[in-house]
């Protein structure tokens, strides 16, 4: 229940009086059965999990509910994955996070107008990140040498940095790594 599996979800689901469904292994049949049997409405997974579902035999996908919300993290979803998820009636959202900032830390905020675009353009837009998750105080792309924001031109490289009360306090018994990671007050 951690890597690319929405560690925030167990708490969110409990807060909403929902039910968590956990599987012992990643298996398309087991996932689809759980969605049908338990009425799963939201789930998280690494790209390989979504790819497994998209490429599963059609017979396994029969009777799936539509409107299931899915999060993908670890890599931008390719056009074929977005298209396959849409064909199953699932809504895929790309998020980014890491253990140190209790992901998801940023989310690709989709726009309704994107629904009218072709799959290639939707995939390009869905690959983007940058809207900070509401629990983060700040997220910004900075030049790590100058600690200044980089131009928002889609070309200039920088590092995404975070501030907020859900950023870790530091690395256990490693003050030097903590100092390096929080240079300038940003993680």
Regions found by a protein language model. Give the residues of each.
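Adenylate-forming
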Residues: 2, 29, 33-36, 47-69, ...
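Short, Asp-centered acidic motifs that coordinate Mg2+ and/or phosphate
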Residues: 41-42, 69
């Amino acid at each position: 229940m951690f890597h690319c599996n929405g560690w925030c979800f167990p708490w969110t689901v409990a807060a909403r009086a929902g039910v968590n469904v956990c599987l012992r292994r990643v298996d398309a049949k087991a996932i689809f059965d759980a969605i049908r049997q338990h009425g799963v409405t939201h789930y998280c997974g690494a790209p390989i999990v979504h790819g497994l579902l998209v490429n599963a035999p059609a017979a396994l996908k029969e009777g799936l509910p539509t409107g299931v919300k899915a999060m993908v993290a670890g890599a931008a979803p390719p056009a074929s994955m977005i298209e396959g998820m849409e064909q199953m009636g699932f809504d895929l959202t790309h998020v980014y996070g890491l253990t140190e900032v209790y992901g998801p830390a940023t989310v690709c905020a989709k726009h309704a107008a994107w629904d009218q675009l072709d799959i290639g353009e939707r995939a390009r837009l869905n690959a983007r990140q940058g809207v900070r998750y509401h629990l983060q105080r700040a997220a910004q792309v900075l030049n790590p040498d100058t600690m200044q924001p980089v131009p928002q031109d889609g070309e200039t490289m920088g590092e995404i940095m975070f501030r907020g009360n859900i950023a870790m306090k530091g690395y256990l018994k490693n003050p030097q790594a903590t100092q390096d990671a929080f240079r300038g007050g940003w993680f």
